[in-house]
A protein has these predicted regions:
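Active-site pocket scaffolds in enzymes
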Residues: 54-56
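Short, solvent-exposed beta-strand/turn "edge" segments of beta-rich domains on protein surfaces
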Residues: 60-64
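Solvent-exposed adhesion/ligand-recognition segments of exported proteins
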Residues: 25, 30-31
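Accessory beta-strand-rich segments of carbohydrate-active enzymes
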Residues: 4-25, 38-46, 65-181
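Conserved, charged catalytic cores of large soluble enzymes
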Residues: 32-33, 37
Length: 181
């Protein structure tokens, strides 16, 4: 019996262009860089001062207490639309994020250290695909977890005090990169 091997060709479309972002409770959109982080987008759009200059960081502790929305629109070429399988791949969503494709929630992420691969063929259209990532504040998610415990976990590297959370060391609840201070 003779076996033949089919060579499958993977086609990749990077979605790094055309992103915008906003504070979830506000309506003003600003240009965003993806991949990136909200702090650099805020700085690039002159919404905040340089956090590394003098004591500016102290006045920027509100950022991680807010929810943020990132959005882009993309089109697929006709040959891509003929593909049987399509996946959307995220490498490092920080951290609590809901991902929507054309108003369908396709992912609820909770771990910055993993790659997320989501089958999306059923949600994709050739034009005007709207991809939205809603980033939840880790403070809003994790403070209730801390409050619910009758004891405290050790977290000597936690920066909660600097962020105005006093002794609520919430970093132990999130699969998220820590501050490098």
């Amino acid at each position: 019996m003779k076996h033949t091997r089919m060579k499958l060709k993977t086609v990749v479309k990077n979605l790094h262009e055309g992103w915008k972002f906003r504070q979830a409770r506000l309506t003003n959109w600003y240009p965003a860089t993806v991949p990136g982080v909200v702090h650099t987008d805020l700085l690039q759009n002159k919404i905040i001062e340089d956090p590394f200059f003098r004591l500016n960081e102290r006045g920027l502790q509100w950022i991680d207490k807010e929810d943020w929305v990132y959005e882009t629109c993309f089109t697929l070429a006709a040959d891509m639309m003929r593909k049987e399988n399509m996946e959307l791949v995220f490498e490092g969503l920080d951290t609590y994020a809901d991902v929507y494709l054309n108003d369908e929630c396709i992912l609820k992420a909770d771990n910055m250290f993993r790659c997320w691969s989501i089958p999306v063929r059923q949600y994709i259209r050739e034009e005007n695909n709207i991809l939205k990532v809603y980033f939840h504040s880790p403070v809003k998610i994790d403070v209730p977890k801390w409050d619910a415990l009758p004891y405290q976990y050790p977290a000597s590297n936690d920066q909660s005090e600097n962020g105005g959370l006093f002794n609520k060391k919430i970093s132990i609840f999130a699969r998220k990169a820590g501050d490098r201070k």
